[in-house]
Each structure stands twice: as C-alpha cells, then as structure tokens.
Amino acid sequence: MNALSKAIMAETLCDELKLNKPVAKEMVENFFEELRHALENGQHVKLSGFGNFTLRDKPQRPGRNPKTGEEIPVEARRVVTFKPGLKLKTKIEKIGK
C-alpha cells in the first residue's frame, strides 16, 4: 500500500485543475500550514465530510522504563486526535467489504 504525500497531492492538483506545479505545491503547503496554525492556537479543525482534528490534554501518569523496570512519571501533554466523519467512515467500510 502506498502513502499519499504532499507531492502526490500537488501533482493531482496540477492534473485535475490544470495548475502549474509551483502554484499547486504552494496550495498544498498553505492548506497544511493553516491546519497546523489552527491546532497550535488551540482550535479544533472540522473538515466537513472528512473528519475532525481535536486537541486533548492527557494528565501526568505513572510509567515504567521497560529495560530497568524503574518507575518514571510520564509528563502531562497535549495530543492531536482525529475522528473520521460519517462520509469517510462509510466509504472506508465499503472498501473493506
């Protein structure tokens, strides 16, 4: 299975919308920059028909060093989670059948 990269996305924009390569690359970069910027500023990102990127604060918890068995605290942190939208879920489920 191949991965979808920014370069492939830019190529698709070139082919589908007849854009030149630098403009397509810039559009892809700007899209991801806006996503990153919103998340860095504590905003949730909702992409209709695709899904939602949300921020979740995880509290500090006890952890263990697997090599030594020593107990160490895992620091509190903020993580990004993705929840697929209904349309995306439905399409993926159909592919799996």
Curated annotation (Swiss-Prot):
A single GO BP: positive regulation of metabolic process
Species per Swiss-Prot/TrEMBL record: Legionella pneumophila (strain Corby)
Protein name per UniProt: Integration host factor subunit alpha
Alphabetized SMART domains for the sequence: BHL (SM00411)
Claim: NAD is one of the keywords in the record: no
Region entry Disordered, spans: 50-71
Assembly and interaction partners: Heterodimer of an alpha and a beta chain.
Functional summary from the UniProt entry: This protein is one of the two subunits of integration host factor, a specific DNA-binding protein that functions in genetic recombination as well as in transcriptional and translational control.
Family: Belongs to the bacterial histone-like protein family.
InterPro entries associated with the record: Hist_DNA-bd (IPR000119), Histone-like_DNA-bd_CS (IPR020816), IHF-like_DNA-bd_dom_sf (IPR010992), IHF_alpha (IPR005684)
Entries under PROSITE patterns matching the protein: HISTONE_LIKE
Alphabetical keyword list: DNA recombination, DNA-binding, Transcription, Transcription regulation, Translation regulation
Gene Ontology cellular component annotations, sorted alphabetically: cytosol
MF-aspect GO terms: DNA binding; structural constituent of chromatin
Pfam short name (any one): Bac_DNA_binding
Encoding gene (name): ihfA
